[in-house]
A protein has these predicted regions:
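Periplasmic-side early beta-strands and strand-to-turn transitions of outer-membrane beta-barrels
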Residues: 182-183, 195, 203-204, 212, ...
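Outer-membrane beta-barrel domain signature, strongest for Gram-negative TonB-dependent receptors
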Residues: 257-378, 512
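Gram-negative outer-membrane beta-barrel transporters
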Residues: 410-417, 518-522, 540-634
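C-terminal beta-signal and adjacent terminal beta-strands/loops
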Residues: 458, 650-696
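Short acidic/polar hinge/loop motifs at secondary-structure boundaries
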Residues: 150-178
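Extracytoplasmic beta-strand/coil segments of soluble accessory domains associated
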Residues: 75-92, 108, 112-153, 172
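Surface-exposed extracellular loop regions of Gram-negative outer-membrane beta-barrel proteins
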Residues: 287, 293-298, 380-384, 394, ...
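Outer membrane beta-barrel strand-and-loop segments of large Gram-negative receptors
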Residues: 264, 352-358, 396-398, 402-404, ...
C-alpha cells in the first residue's frame, strides 16, 4: 500500500478507527519544519524589521491587528452592522488576506479555514459541506448567500457548489455563522449561514490581470477593470475562466474534468448624501464532470455515464438604501436568478425571483428595532429522461412569504444587551412556520465578551422530499428486484432547537481566543417510512419493487465546541487555527425503523477537526504561508482519518506585481475525503500551481 490514506486498489481494506500513519508522519514533519523555520528566521527578523518597514507594502497586503479584528463590523448575525466583539453568535470572518494567502482556487476550499465547517472534496468539482454535522454534497441545512442573494436550490434544499464563483480577489470577507440563523434568514438556515460579501466598487478601481496553472488546476485566467465617472458612480466588470483536471480514479475513468467561464459587473451609485443604489450581475457557462448511474427496467438494467454535462445561469440584483437619519434607515433588495442544468439523468431549468424590505430604527432608550418582509417565487421545469427517475409534477412553483421582527434591548449600556426576535414564514410545502430566538450579550471589559442564545429553526421540505420518484436496481435477475424511493406530501419541516454559549477574549493584544459551545436537538429529520413489497408488470418485464416513502422518521442530537485562537507574537508572523469537536447521534422516532439513514448520518461527520495556519511576512516582500488540516474518520463514507498540508510562497517585487507558487495536499499522493454514490471513491491528488497577478 502506498503512503496515501486512500487505497490504490478497491480491494484493499481501510481501517476506519486508527489514524493514518502518513497523517502522523505529516504532523511530525510539519512541526519539525516549523521549528527549523523559527530557529532560522528568529535571528534575522529583528535586523530585517527596519528594512521591511521602509518598503511600504501595498494597502491590500497590510494586516489587521488582533484588536482591529475584534472591531471589524459584520452584518450576517443581525442584518445590521455590529462589531464582532458585540455579536451574540458563533461568527468567524475569513478576510481577503486570509483568502489570498490560503492558496485556494475556489470558494468551497476557502471555507476550510472556518472552525466547525466540514468541507470535503468528493471529486474535482463537487464538495460535501456542512456545519456542526449533517454534511453532504447538497448542504441541505445550510444557507449560503452571495451579496445577500440566496443560492439555495428548492429542488433538493441545497447548494450547487461548483457554480458559486467570482473573482476571489474581489471578495472582501466571508462571514460564517455556526448555529441556527432562521430568525434573520428564514428557511434552510438551520445549522449555519455563509455570507460571501464582495468589495465595494470604490475599492476596485484600476485593472487586475491574473494567470495561473498547474497539474490539476490546469489553467486559470482572470481580468477585472474598475473605475468611476467622478459623480458618485463607481463600477467594475470582470471575466474569468478555468479548466481543472480530474482527481485520482482507481478505475482510470477520469470523469470529473471541470471547465467554466464567467462574466460579471457591479455598480455602486451614491445618488446623494442619503441614497445608495447598487446593481450587479453575473453570467456563467460550464461543463460539470461527474459519474452518474441510472437503473433501467430492461437489460443491461444499469447504465453508467462518465463525463461532463452543461451547466449555466445568471443573476441580476438591485439594492436601494436610504439613510433617513442617524437612527433610522431602510433597504429594499430584489434579484432574479436563472439556473440551467442538463445532466444525463434529468434536466432542470429554474427561475427565481426574490424581493425583501428591511427597516431599522433606534428608539428612545437605545433599543434597536429591525422589521422586515419578503417574498420568493421559484418556478421550475424538470425534464424526465428515464422512467426510473422523475419528479411529479414536472413543473412546480415554490413560494415563500415572510416577515420578521427583532428588538435589541440595552439592559446595561455598553455592557449587557438582550436580543429578541422571530421569523414568520409561509411556504407551499409545510404552511406556516415560526422561528424565534433569544440572545444575551455581556461585555464586562473592552476585551472580553460572553454570550448565550436559544433558537428554533426549520428546514422546509424541498421538491425532493415530496415529489421524488427514484428507482434503483437491487438484484438484476431471478427475480429482478428494485428499490423505489418516493416523496411524500406528508413530509413536513425538519426542526431544530439550539442552545449556544460563547466567549471571546483578547490577551495582551497578542492572543485572540474565540470559544463556542453548543447543543442542538433535532426532530422530524429526513428518513424512510414503512416499506411495501409488490410485483409490478408495467413497464415490462415484470419485476419486484420494494418501495420506501420519505418521512420525518428520525430524531437527533449534536453537542460539541469550537475553539479558534489567533496569535500574533510579532508583526511579521501570525499563527492561527481551530479545533472542532462534534458528537452526533441520530436515532429512529417511535414507530419507525430506518437503519440506512441513522448509520449514514452518524458516520458522515468527523468527531475531530484541526486547522493550523502560519503566515510569515519576510523582508524583501516575500511571504511564506502553510496550512495543516486534520480530519478524523468518516466510517459511513469509507474514509479514514487524514491529515494534509498546503504551502504557499509569495513575492511582491513591486507593488503592482505578485508571484506565487502553491502546493496543495502535500502529505500523500492522494487521499479520500468523502464517499461516492457510484462505485469507487475518488482520491484527491497532491497538486501544485503557479500564479502571477498584475494590478494597476
Amino acid at each position: 500500500m502506498s503512503g496515501s490514506c486512500f487505497p490504490n486498489r478497491p480491494s484493499e481494506e481501510i481501517d476506519f478507527h486508527r489514524p493514518c500513519r502518513s497523517s502522523i508522519r505529516g504532523i511530525t514533519t510539519v512541526s519539525t519544519l516549523a521549528l527549523l523555520l523559527w530557529l532560522t528566521v528568529t535571528g534575522q527578523m529583528t535586523r530585517a524589521q527596519v528594512a521591511q518597514n521602509n518598503q511600504n507594502p501595498p494597502e491590500n497586503l497590510k494586516h489587521l491587528s488582533l484588536e482591529q479584528l475584534g472591531n471589524v463590523e459584520v452584518t450576517t448575525a443581525s442584518k445590521e452592522p455590529e462589531q464582532i466583539w458585540r455579536t451574540p453568535a458563533a461568527i468567524y470572518v475569513i478576510t481577503q488576506n486570509d483568502i489570498r494567502r490560503s492558496g485556494a482556487t475556489s470558494i468551497a476550499e476557502v471555507l476550510r479555514l472556518a472552525p466547525g465547517l466540514e468541507v470535503a472534496r468528493t471529486d474535482s468539482d463537487h464538495w460535501a459541506v456542512g456545519v456542526r454535522g449533517f454534511g453532504g454534497q447538497f448542504s441541505k441545512s445550510l444557507l449560503v448567500l452571495v451579496d445577500g442573494r440566496s443560492v439555495y436550490s428548492p429542488l433538493f434544499a441545497g447548494v450547487y457548489w461548483q457554480v458559486q464563483d467570482t473573482l476571489l480577489e474581489d471578495i472582501e470577507r466571508i462571514e460564517v455563522i455556526r448555529g441556527p440563523g432562521g430568525t434573520i434568514w428564514g428557511a434552510n438556515a438551520v445549522n449555519g449561514v455563509i455570507d460571501i460579501i464582495t468589495k465595494s466598487t470604490k475599492d476596485t478601481h484600476g485593472m487586475l490581470v491574473s494567470l495561473g496553472g498547474g497539474n490539476v488546476d490546469q489553467g486559470i485566467g482572470e481580468v477585472r477593470m474598475g473605475g468611476t465617472n467622478g459623480k458618485g458612480l463607481d463600477y467594475r466588470v470582470y471575466g474569468k475562466g478555468f479548466i481543472r483536471g480530474p482527481e485520482f480514479h482507481p478505475d482510470g475513468s477520469n470523469f470529473d474534468l471541470w471547465k467554466t467561464g464567467q462574466l460579471g459587473f457591479r455598480t455602486d451609485w451614491n445618488l446623494n448624501t442619503r441614497d445608495m443604489l447598487t446593481l450587479q450581475g453575473d453570467l456563467y457557462q460550464g461543463l460539470d464532470g461527474e459519474r452518474v448511474a441510472i437503473s433501467l427496467y430492461t437489460p443491461p438494467s444499469r447504465q453508467v455515464f462518465n463525463g461532463p454535462h452543461d451547466v449555466g445561469g445568471g443573476n441580476l440584483l438591485g439594492r436601494w438604501q436610504r439613510q433617513f437619519s442617524k437612527d433610522s434607515d431602510i433597504q429594499i433588495q430584489g434579484y432574479f436568478d436563472r439556473t440551467t442544468r442538463y445532466s444525463p439523468q434529468l434536466d432542470e431549468i429554474r427561475n427565481t425571483f426574490d424581493i425583501d424590505l428591511l427597516y431599522h430604527v433606534t428608539v428612545k432608550g437605545g433599543q434597536s428595532v429591525l422589521v422586515g418582509i419578503g417574498g420568493r417565487w421559484s418556478p421550475d421545469a424538470i425534464v424526465q429522461k428515464f422512467a426510473t427517475l422523475d419528479f411529479q409534477p414536472h413543473n412546480e412553483t415554490d413560494s415563500i412569504y415572510s416577515g420578521f421582527l427583532q428588538d435589541q434591548i440595552n439592559l446595561v449600556p455598553d455592557k449587557v444587551a438582550l436580543t429578541l426576535g422571530s421569523k414568520f414564514e409561509h411556504n407551499n410545502y409545510s404552511g406556516f412556520e415560526i422561528q424565534p430566538n433569544a440572545r444575551l450579550l455581556w461585555t464586562p471589559t473592552s476585551h472580553q465578551t460572553f454570550w448565550a442564545a436559544v433558537t428554533r429553526a426549520v428546514r422546509t421540505p424541498s421538491r425532493l422530499d415530496q415529489d421524488l420518484q427514484l428507482t434503483l436496481l437491487l438484484q438484476p435477475a431471478n427475480p429482478t428486484i428494485y428499490l423505489r424511493v418516493v416523496g411524500s406530501k406528508k413530509f413536513s419541516s425538519e426542526q431544530l432547537l439550539g442552545t449556544e454559549f460563547g466567549y471571546r477574549t483578547l490577551i495582551a493584544k497578542k492572543l485572540y481566543v474565540d470559544l463556542a459551545v453548543f447543543q442542538n436537538a433535532y426532530d422530524d429529520l429526513y428518513g424512510y417510512g414503512q416499506g411495501t413489497i409488490f410485483v409490478e408488470n408495467s413497464p415490462p418485464p415484470p419485476h419486484v419493487v420494494f418501495q420506501l416513502p420519505l418521512a420525518n422518521a428520525l430524531k437527533g442530537d449534536t453537542t460539541g465546541f469550537e475553539i479558534a485562537p489567533n496569535w500574533k507574537p510579532v508583526e511579521w508572523w501570525e499563527l492561527k487555527g481551530s479545533y472542532s469537536f462534534l458528537h452526533l447521534y441520530v436515532h429512529d422516532k417511535a414507530g419507525f425503523t430506518d437503519n440506512l439513514n441513522t448509520v449514514s448520518d452518524n458516520g458522515s461527520s468527523p468527531h475531530h477537526q484541526v486547522v493550523i495556519q502560519s503566515l510569515f511576512s519576510f523582508p524583501k516582500k516575500f511571504e511564506f504561508d502553510a496550512t495543516y488540516r486534520y480530519v478524523s474518520a468518516l466510517p459511513a463514507q469509507l474514509v479514514s482519518a487524514y491529515g494534509t498540508a498546503d504551502v504557499r510562497l509569495g513575492w511582491h517585487p513591486v507593488p503592482s506585481w505578485e508571484l506565487s507558487i502553491v502546493g496543495q495536499n502535500l502529505l500523500q499522493p492522494h487521499h479520500a475525503e468523502f464517499g461516492s454514490d457510484v462505485d469507487t471513491i475518488v482520491g484527491i491528488k497532491r497538486s501544485a500551481y503557479a500564479k502571477i497577478v498584475w494590478r494597476r
